[in-house]
């Protein structure tokens, strides 16, 4: 699919996605998706990424988030989507891959747009700027907040950093996610670690 440049086409597709997620997601998740769309638009303007693509992916990124567990397993099996051992245990991670496949079939999303949806759950060393924007927008959209004062402070700092250095924002978001996952006794996906290490390695090389 060609880059989204036609404003009317973009609005029509945004309306279609909006109608779909209204039906398929809870009100809270729907509001989050709209928030991610707005934050993705903001970051796309800063980093000179196709704004239409950022908005479309931001709105659609969680389209498979609330699919029942059994349905997720059935979907990846029927569509022959490869999943790893951690994804088999932590079913929540599958909504990225499933969402990417849904958006390819329903909305004819480009490969880059699909990858941005797939990678938003764990990160990926091969993320391009669109994927990084969606990853960070998911963590920093204005509707997100924490009752814990320290976590809220970290969120505000991440929002500020995201407008200056998107790579640093991705790395910090992954760091915080790893710490939180360890505290909860959860499994850490290797893609997150690989992404963090790549970003840090690039930073050290340029120092």
Question: What spans do the regions from the language model cover?
Answer:
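Active-site hotspot residues in diverse enzymes, especially metal/ion-binding acidic/histidine motifs
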Residues: 39
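Charged phosphate-binding loop/patch that engages nucleotide di/tri-phosphates or the phosphate backbone
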Residues: 176-207
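Divalent metal-dependent catalytic cores for phosphoryl transfer on phosphate-bearing substrates
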Residues: 16-24, 32, 46-170
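Generic N-terminal amphipathic, Lys/Arg-enriched alpha-helix
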Residues: 1-5, 9-25
């Amino acid at each position: 699919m060609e880059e989204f440049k036609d404003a009317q086409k973009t609005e029509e597709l945004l309306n279609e996605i909006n109608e779909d997620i209204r039906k398929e997601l809870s009100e809270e998740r729907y509001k989050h998706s709209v928030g991610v769309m707005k934050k993705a638009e903001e970051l796309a303007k800063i980093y000179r990424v196709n704004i239409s693509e950022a908005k479309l992916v931001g709105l659609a990124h969680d389209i498979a988030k609330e699919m029942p567990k059994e349905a997720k397993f059935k979907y990846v099996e029927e569509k022959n989507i490869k999943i790893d051992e951690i994804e088999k245990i932590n079913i929540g991670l599958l909504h990225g891959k499933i969402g990417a496949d849904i958006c390819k079939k329903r909305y004819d999303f480009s490969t880059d747009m699909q990858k941005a949806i797939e990678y938003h759950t764990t990160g990926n060393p091969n993320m391009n700027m669109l994927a990084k924007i969606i990853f960070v927008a998911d963590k920093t959209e204005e509707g997100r907040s924490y009752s814990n004062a320290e976590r809220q402070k970290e969120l505000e700092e991440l929002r500020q950093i995201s407008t200056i250095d998107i790579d640093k924002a991705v790395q910090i978001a992954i760091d915080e996610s790893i710490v939180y996952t360890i505290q909860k006794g959860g499994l850490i996906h290797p893609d997150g670690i690989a992404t963090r290490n790549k970003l840090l390695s690039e930073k050290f090389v340029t120092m």
